[in-house]
Curated annotation (Swiss-Prot):
It comes from Thermotoga petrophila (strain ATCC BAA-488 / DSM 13995 / JCM 10881 / RKU-1). It comes from the Bacteria. GO terms for cellular component: cytosolic small ribosomal subunit. This is Small ribosomal subunit protein bS18. One of its GO terms (molecular function) is structural constituent of ribosome.
């Protein structure tokens, strides 16, 4: 009996669908969607972001943390 492999659903980049060219560090509501409960950045294989937008999100989160808009840790 042969088993059929289940194909993984390819996640699409939400930021590409929204046609965003720039991820603003002041948009904390958008950036908080890419953080875990503890405040860590969620990897792109879980969020479905493309490489370009994942880098932009990473830089924006780090800038927002430096400015004090996002916490480093959520306790």
């Amino acid at each position: 009996m042969a088993y059929k492999r289940k194909r993984k659903k390819v996640k699409k980049c939400r930021l590409c669908e929204m046609e965003l060219d720039y991820v603003d560090y002041k948009d904390t509501r958008l950036l908080s969607e890419f953080l875990t409960d503890k405040g860590k950045i969620i990897p792109k294989r879980l969020t479905g972001n493309c490489s370009k937008h994942q880098r932009m999100v990473k830089v924006a989160i780090k800038r927002a943390r430096q400015m004090g808009l996002l916490p480093y840790l959520k306790i």
